[in-house]
Amino acid sequence: MKRLFVDLDICNKCEECKVCCSYFYHPQNNGIASVREYATFATICRHCEEAPCVNSCYHNALERASDGHIKRYKMRCTSCKSCSVACPFGIIFQDFIPYLDSRCDYCIGQSGKLPKCVTSCPEKALDIKEIEEDLEKNIYFVGEYLAVHTRKWSKEDMQVKKK
């Protein structure tokens, strides 16, 4: 199955995102922002046991999901940035927490045509392709339609380094 592939290592180096989106219901949509947030929370967030970001949110917009990951309820979020300030690792970037939410539908159903985000990314950080999850190459599946290349943080990595 083809997936939207995002190379966060390339994407995060870009100084000014020029990616366009063709999301039908909202032409001013910035779908890549929601994809980057989703991928970052799933692969880079440290998922702290105490989770200061969750405790700092006055609107209960963040919570720990049953799988241990931190989840943001976008309709509760007022973009106050308290989670960003509280994150001890600086993982929650303030520009990832917009008040107005954008959506990505991964352009499901656009067969034979590349999504506008892929064709408009000047750094080639996005692609649609058949790809296998490969932990040794830092390629992770996030959800059903997204594959991400990034350095994933894990508690196991830190325990190995301490020894």
Q: Could you say what each language-model-derived stretch is?
A:
Residues 40-47, 54, 75-163:
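Flanking helices and flexible, charged tails adjoining ferredoxin-like Fe-S electron-transfer domains
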